[in-house]
Amino acid sequence: HQGPLYKRKGFAMKENKFQADLKKELKSRFPGCIVTKLDSADIQGIPDLLVLYKDKWAALEVKKSATASHRPNQDYYVEKMDNMSFSKFIYPENKEEVLDELHQAFES
């Protein structure tokens, strides 16, 4: 067994597959949370996902890999929304770290 396909060396999982799996994992880790997609056609650079949990929220910009390029305004909105609450770029290589940080933020 080689582990999840997106963790295999040399294989870059498509962003939409990683995002779909991530949404399921968020709902499992944070029971009762709402995970919804934000519309970058409305605000260019807005993060992909909004996570609502109890009285907290987080925004996650999903990338297929650590080296995937950032679109215009993404850095601005991730930083701005992180200052408001919690926002990060998330990709397979840092997923566990970001989800652990998110857990700490949601439980604080």
Regions found by a protein language model. Give the residues of each.
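Catalytic phosphate/metal-binding cores of nucleic-acid and nucleotide-processing enzymes, i.e., regions
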Residues: 1-108
